[in-house]
Amino acid sequence: MKIKIGTRPSNLAVAQANMVASSLEAIGIDTEIVKHRSAGDIDTKNPIYSIGKTGVFVQDLNNMILRGEIDVAVHSAKDIPSEIENRLTIAATLKRGSFNDALVSKYDLRSLPISAKVGTSSIRRIFQLKYARQDLKFENIRGNIETRIAKMSELGLDAIVMAEAAIQRLGLNVEYSKLDENKFVPAPNQGIIAVVSKKEGTVRKILEEINDENTFEEMQIERSVVQQLKLGCSTPVGILSRPSGKGHKIIAQFFSMQGDDVSVFEQYLNDLSDVDSLVSYIRENIPREYGYIASEE
């Protein structure tokens, strides 16, 4: 049997697809990589939060599964909307890579010059950096990882922010410092490679053989918070679940839409079922003026 693996054409996306292909080939499954440009690849000028729709990097590939053009789609899990087409499912995750954000610069955060220019299109990252350094200036940059790094010199930027996992998976030789995940809580599911397939059929059963169960549970916990609070992919929120004892410690960081206030919630969870109590606590305690937390139905 050969499994057709759909991916975006960027070097990072292809590298991640190749990681999935290697895992499948290790259990005796032949694979073929199919590249396809998404809406998010085509519009590289506007910030993600201004495009006005969710799943800009994943919808086209998922539709290709439904049309039978590919068997699976490989995504960065953080790009997958909290709700996907009901005939599809996230069937597997590879072992989680680094979840940290990285400040790509010859400076670390403390030594960045006054009023330094930092490149990012993420509203979460902008607010986190502003909260740490109110003097910083920001420049919207989009495009693949290599393009963003090239724009540092083109735009005269002092730093850019990106996922450390991307740097590691591409084997890039760039100077960077890791940002503290307790202050710069990453996007939900950052560092996780997810594989989407049809809910029914042989392919899903095969994917279960390459699934990393610990990572899958972390993904479910973080996604459950997003789903229950009805958070959009462009809201200024960081969520991270990590193993702790026999359960998980979760940290959730919420910024007001103006970026001038932040609320942080930490809780120990035994398993996925404990997310309900965390979500209830967040609803009760987050300031109403944040405006994007859905009330309980």
Curated annotation (Swiss-Prot):
Reaction catalyzed: 4 porphobilinogen + H2O = hydroxymethylbilane + 4 NH4(+)
Keyword Lyase attached: no
A GO cellular-component term linked to this record: cytoplasm
Cofactor(s) for this UniProt protein: dipyrromethane
Species the sequence originates in: Thermoplasma volcanium (strain ATCC 51530 / DSM 4299 / JCM 9571 / NBRC 15438 / GSS1)
More about this protein: The porphobilinogen subunits are added to the dipyrromethane group.
Enzyme Commission number: 2.5.1.61
Biochemical pathway: Porphyrin-containing compound metabolism; protoporphyrin-IX biosynthesis; coproporphyrinogen-III from 5-aminolevulinate: step 2/4
Family: Belongs to the HMBS family.
Function: Tetrapolymerization of the monopyrrole PBG into the hydroxymethylbilane pre-uroporphyrinogen in several discrete steps.
One Pfam entry name: Porphobil_deam
Keyword tags: Porphyrin biosynthesis, Transferase
Co-factor: note: Binds 1 dipyrromethane group covalently.
GO BP annotation list: protoporphyrinogen IX biosynthetic process
First-tier enzyme category under EC: transferase
Record's protein name: Probable porphobilinogen deaminase
Molecular function as annotated in GO: hydroxymethylbilane synthase activity
Residue numbers bearing the S-(dipyrrolylmethanemethyl)cysteine modification: 233
Record carries keyword Transferase: yes
